[in-house]
Amino acid sequence: AALAIDLNIGLDRNKVRGALEDTRLANDMYTDAHARLMITRGTKVKPFQHPSLSLSGPTMVIIMEHSKALSARPIRLSTVPHMRGLPMTQDPKLNSHSKLNCVLACIAAEKAGADEALMLDINGFVNTTNACNFFIVRNGTVWTSTGDYCMNGITRQKVIDVCRENNISVKEKNFSLVETYGATEAFVTGTFGAQTPVREIDGRIIGDKDLGPVTEKI
């Protein structure tokens, strides 16, 4: 991602790993540590866009904290008009600080009384939430979006791998809101949320219990 946006971090991969390890050890963290790595272009002489105005070169911030198991409380989603960016505008596969569309989606969902926003892609198919990847279960098969218009998260891929390794049918495909409303199970995935069940979408109850059998098996 840094190479794609012409950002020279000034450190190779091993040195970045070393900085993460140094931060972990400095905080006496040995298990279940979560590292958030953020890199900017550094301090600027003026608050303008051009990268050449940076005075100090890249700034790297490492926030190290212990991951805590989140409640298994199922969440509510609300569909919003905001979409993830397109590759020619703001590629959703770039994990950048500039995610105003996701922030606006989050605000819209909150105002609708939901926990997260369900976002569609440019073709009207179900894509992702404002912060997590999204899955449904229909007829025992796990569905998630094609991944063309969302961040293909590590936990998302782990769920797909677990399904394939355990003979659980899984598909990366286009699917509609109507198909989503008819799902028997739904869940979201993310680094902190891991695998969180979804109980309600746009006021429609999904499934007949909080944690469906396929979700529980995964």
Which positions does each model-derived feature cover?
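Conserved alpha/beta cores of soluble small-molecule-handling proteins
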Residues: 1-118, 122-125, 151, 160-218
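Glycine- and Gly-Pro-enriched alpha-helical subdomains that act as flexible
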Residues: 118, 125-147, 152
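Secondary-structure junction motif
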Residues: 155-157
